[in-house]
């Protein structure tokens, strides 16, 4: 038994007990085993780690793709803060009234409540991290 697990047996009501115990068992998932789905904004997503495939409660990580010439639908999330990390392609990111060019290596912060969309000039592939985890119910379209 790990040191963390043995210590938790002495404190059965520790506030982080379930979080720590779930972290003790390693979860490794390969993106190739995750089926793609389309989000409300029109992007194609493959969940890497989220509530649907792992013991995740506070965040999610997915790979998103947007074909060349396509713009996702303008939307916002009331609760989720998002990070995008551009892996491939190029495009334009719009948050509120600001638009910027994005290329591989760029990281983008999207605050809760911020209207946003992305346009792929060259097919985009990017990581999307959300906290709390992504939910269709927390996606509001224009």
Where are these regions (language model features)?
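Acidic, Ala/Val/Gly-enriched low-complexity intrinsically disordered segments
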Residues: 3-7, 23
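A short, N-terminal "cap"/entry segment at the start of jelly-roll beta-barrel domains
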Residues: 11-58, 73, 139-142
